[in-house]
Amino acid sequence: GDYDVSRNGWVMDYNDPSNMLELFTTNNGNNDGKYANPEFDAAIDASKVADKSVHFQKLHEAEDILMKDAAAIPVAYYNDFWLQSPTLKGTWHSPYGYWYLQYGYIEE
């Protein structure tokens, strides 16, 4: 559509900044804002190496480009809060933010 600004969200699938940053590559199917910058794409491509130091350096460069272009404005990060009795056992929380109680039990 024809718009100046929109809101979008993403829950990280895995624990790496590339999970968020790759959303803004030109050909990413989830690049809803249609952001395109060859310099950004090149930094993301250069981050796909085994050397973690180079990986994070290139991702930081990509992030700097994204912020300089104001292609995204991070405004919030999801948090979960949970109060649980120490006697409740067997529950777990997924990286997607879901709480699983089906294996829960009370330990007396």
Annotate each PLM feature:
Residues S6-G9, K52-P86:
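Bilobed periplasmic-binding protein-like "clamshell/Venus-flytrap" ligand-binding domains
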Residues K48-V49, V54, H60, I65-K68, ...:
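Extracellular/periplasmic bilobal clamshell ligand-binding domains
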Residues G1, N19-A46, Y77-E108:
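Short, solvent-exposed loop/beta-turn-alpha elements that line the ligand-binding surface or hinge
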